Amino acid sequence: MTAAAPPAAAPAPADTIPGDGTYLVGTDIQPGTYKTAGPDNSAGDCYWQRSKDSSGSFDSIIANDNLAGQGVVTIRSSDGAFKSQGCQAWVKAG
């Protein structure tokens, strides 16, 4: 009988948010303060949203904004998800 290999550890949450998408806090991304250079030029504006969860419902939104230039957002450990659309990468600043 051969012993089974231990399960692989789940990857750590990322400290860079690559761009468009909805990311789960604590699973996909780390809480913290992130900076972006602004819109990726595909949409004209950079939209971000902090949410209670990933449901997409209006009631889930904690905070959001449309950026025409550079931006900073603090994602809290109590946030459920972070959405980014039309933005360059978000890089953790602290």
PLM features per residue range, with description:
Residues 1-6, 40-94:
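Primarily secretory-pathway and cell-envelope proteins
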Residues 12, 16-22, 53-54:
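Extracellular beta-strand-rich, repetitive "passenger/adhesive" scaffolds
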Residues 19-21, 30-33, 78:
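A glycine-anchored, Pro-Gly-centered beta-turn/N-cap motif
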